[in-house]
């Protein structure tokens, strides 16, 4: 490891297993307002704000279950939005779904992407002038 403030490595991108990478790339590009920079049957990639997310085809892919008491959830993305209800409605219109179990008590919202993987919506922090 480097000295305090220095890093040994830099994150270049995140890759996520998927049943249908092209579909997931289209979904997240629309959800985030990013660009699909690569897409075929085995891999999809989106990019925006200097961040890349890749989606790789995994035969027999099974998404995490939500809620999952067994702890099989592998990861989740947190997306900040201006309005939870409006964002959830917009994302469901392009392929997300909203499970019944919502642990956030209105502080955040859990949705499932088109592959069934959970992700969360949380309010964008207020900025002070």
Language model regions located:
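Active-site beta-strand termini and strand-to-loop segments that position acidic
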Residues: 46-49, 111-114, 124
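Short beta->alpha transition motifs characteristic of CBS
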Residues: 57, 101-102, 121-128
């Amino acid at each position: 490891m480097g000295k305090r403030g220095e890093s040994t490595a830099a994150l270049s991108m995140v890759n996520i297993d998927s049943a249908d990478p092209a579909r997931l790339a289209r979904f997240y590009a629309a959800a985030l307002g990013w660009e699909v920079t690569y897409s075929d049957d085995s891999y999809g990639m989106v990019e925006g704000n200097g961040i890349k997310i890749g989606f790789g085809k995994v035969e027999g892919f099974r998404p995490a279950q939500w809620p999952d008491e067994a702890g099989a959830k592998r990861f989740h993305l947190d997306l900040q939005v201006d309005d939870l209800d409006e964002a959830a409605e917009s994302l469901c219109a392009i392929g997300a779904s909203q499970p019944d179990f919502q642990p956030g008590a209105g502080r955040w919202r859990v949705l499932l992407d088109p592959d069934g993987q959970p992700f969360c919506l949380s309010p964008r922090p207020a900025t002070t002038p």
